[in-house]
UniProtKB/Swiss-Prot annotation:
Family: Belongs to the eIF-3 subunit D family.
Lineage of the organism: Eukaryota, Fungi, Dikarya, Ascomycota, Pezizomycotina
GO molecular function annotations of the record: mRNA cap binding; translation initiation factor activity
Keywords: Cytoplasm, Initiation factor, Protein biosynthesis, RNA-binding
Gene Ontology CC: one annotated term: cytosol
Subunit organization: Component of the eukaryotic translation initiation factor 3 (eIF-3) complex.
InterPro entries referenced in this protein's UniProt entry, alphabetically: eIF3d (IPR007783)
Domain of life: Eukaryota
Organism, scientific name: Aspergillus niger (strain ATCC MYA-4892 / CBS 513.88 / FGSC A1513)
Protein's UniProt name: Eukaryotic translation initiation factor 3 subunit D
Length: 586
């Protein structure tokens, strides 16, 4: 073989200055669409013309397209139409169910519990007022319309929550009272600002006490015997819920200039726990001279005990087209049921014995033995004074609060009397919408009591916070929380007592992270604002304000209203109650 010379190799090189394979002008793959693929996947088809396309212009798709991409992307290992289909693959095999599915039964027929209201006769002469407000008495003025009202065909059925929540109907609530055209909004404060307020919590001192107390029945503290549940009884006892301005004792203390601010514990506790509230409520503030009264309307929402107000999926009001069989689980019906339970539970858990009755300094100020036919309920009214003064104040700022205690109990160690506040939590159905993921009390109350109480603290944060605040304001030694459930989840007529748990108010406040200093800071801020608004007014002029919690936002609004607001409505309500009593007697 002839040797190859280097000169021949150099002569055979191309004349161009490029390096590599020869380039051609024509490209065989020009115009062929490119489909993304993974080099690790086998190709079973050349192209996919049947894939479902995403419409980028559809409303609400922006968030989806931002977080989710097509399956056919580079590196995607999920199966697609491009993948090779194995002949014996059983993943595509499915069975068609042609059986007729039966509709799920919901709750049976049931109306709300009939809660009988009662009023104090001769209340206008003695400054009294209706005892237990008749449920629905204020509906014409929006008395109980602060609950949820969600439209749509879903009724009150539950649903799963996910990324498509933007496409669901929004939950809306009605205000507790309708804002009238002649009302002037003065202030709007959100809860984030209220939560930053703080005032050193005063201890308080007793000014006077009225009423009497029966001893608490300790047998309710024991675990119930199996198949021997205690029924909740409906007892007829005279109980009163008199507002601040119509309390004859507060009127007497105001004339003696014992304080400059007056309120009741149920009204004050709502204001102090305002950042925890969800439903709408309202408080009437009356400023006369140098006196400020925190008052409430006739039939106000403050008189009702809410149920699962703070739950993530709170109970819903039924729409017009919804299933009427679930009417007993609506917020308004549950509130009426819970108010009925709390009233009767406090009466049932005491031993009504005249020998062991503990009478306070004065008799019940709202009871008239000549006109009343029902016996008095065990109740003590303690009027306590709190010092809200600051260093910048020229004169002391004192507040008198009417607090309440339900029963008394002997201390097992030293034998001293301990005053108790008795309240009840109620279970309607652990499987129904609005239950808030609560456990079944019948099977879990004594075995998993901590989990049951923790769930109630989450779902009823504002209710438990108000009760704890009322107990601390009254300087009660203990609290008794009863657990009451329906005898039948489909009926709100019968209830059973499953157990009672005792707490010290301060310990329960620590468990709930309840800061009373924040509550006193809210009260002092409202008082300072009212005084600043009326700084230039005459001392004899009466000014009235309404503080309203927004039904759908964590906001408080302060309105200036005419001095005669709500007075005509209260007179009409009083006349209706008197007429109803006369008809009942006939």
């Amino acid at each position: 073989m002839a040797p190859i010379s280097i000169a021949d190799i150099v002569a055979a090189l191309p004349a161009e200055d490029t390096w590599g394979p020869a380039t051609a002008s024509d490209n065989m793959l020009q115009g062929v669409p490119y489909a993304p693929f993974s080099k690790g996947d086998k190709l079973g088809r050349m192209a996919d013309w049947t894939a479902e396309s995403k419409d980028p212009n559809r409303a609400g798709r922006q968030a989806y397209n931002r977080n989710y991409r097509d399956q056919q992307v580079y590196g995607a290992g999920s199966s697609s139409l491009f993948a090779v289909q194995v002949a014996e693959d059983e993943s595509s095999f499915s069975v068609v169910d042609n059986t007729r599915s039966s509709a799920k039964r919901t709750f049976g027929r049931g109306g709300g519990t009939v809660f009988r209201g009662r009023a104090q006769r001769g209340g206008a002469q003695r400054g009294g007022r209706a005892g237990f407000q008749r449920v629905g008495a204020g509906r014409g003025q929006g008395g109980d319309r602060y609950y949820d009202n969600r439209s749509g065909g879903r009724g009150n059925r539950g649903r799963r929550f996910g990324w498509k929540d933007y496409d669901k109907p929004q939950r809306t609530r009605e205000p507790s009272v309708n804002v009238r055209p002649d009302w002037n909004m003065l202030e709007e404060v959100d809860f984030s600002r209220l939560s930053k307020l703080n005032l050193e919590a005063p201890e308080g001192e007793d000014v006077d006490s009225y009423g009497f107390l029966y001893h608490y029945d300790r047998s309710y503290d024991k675990a119930p015997v199996k198949n021997a549940e205690r029924r909740l009884q409906s007892l007829d006892r005279a109980a009163y819920n008199v507002t601040t301005t119509q309390d004859p004792v507060i009127q007497e203390l105001a004339e003696k200039n014992e304080a400059t601010i007056f309120a009741t514990s149920d009204i004050l506790s709502m204001l102090m726990c305002a950042p925890r509230s969800v439903y709408s409520w309202d408080i009437v503030i009356v400023h006369q001279g140098n006196k400020i009264y925190f008052d409430k309307r006739e039939g106000a929402s403050l008189d009702l005990v809410t149920v699962n107000e703070n739950a993530a999926d709170a109970p819903l009001e039924l729409a017009d087209s919804a299933n009427k069989q679930d009417a007993i689980n609506t917020p308004s019906a549950l509130a009426m049921e819970a108010t009925f339970i709390n009233h009767n539970f406090a009466l049932q858990t005491v031993v009504e014995s005249e020998d062991s009755k503990v009478s306070l300094a004065h008799p019940n100020p709202f009871y008239n033995a000549a006109e009343e036919t029902e016996p008095l309920a065990s109740k003590a009214y303690k009027y306590r004074r709190f010092d809200l003064s600051l260093e910048r104040d020229d004169e002391p700022v004192n507040m008198i609060v009417r607090t309440e205690v339900d029963a008394i109990m002997k201390n097992p160690v030293n034998g001293e009397d301990q005053q108790l506040l008795v309240k009840a939590l109620n279970e309607f159905d652990s499987k129904a919408q609005g239950s808030g993921g609560a456990l079944d009390w019948r099977s879990k109350l004594w075995s998993q009591r901590g989990a049951v109480v923790a769930t109630e603290m989450k779902n009823n944060s504002v209710k438990l916070a108000r009760w704890t605040t009322q107990a601390i304001l009254a300087k009660a030694d203990g609290m008794k929380l009863g657990f009451v459930s329906r005898a039948n989840p489909r009926s709100a007529a019968g209830h059973v007592v499953l157990g009672v748990v005792g707490y010290k108010p301060r310990d329960l406040a620590a468990q709930m992270n309840l800061n009373l200093g924040n509550g006193w800071g809210i009260v002092r801020t409202i008082v300072d604002r009212i005084r600043a608004l009326d700084a230039d007014e005459d001392e004899d002029k009466v000014t009235k304000y309404v503080l309203i919690k927004d039904p759908n936002r964590p906001v408080l609004r302060l309105y200036s209203v005419p001095a005669t607001t709500f007075e005509e409505e209260e007179e009409v309500a009083a006349e209706e109650q008197e007429a109803a009593e006369e008809e009942a007697e006939e």
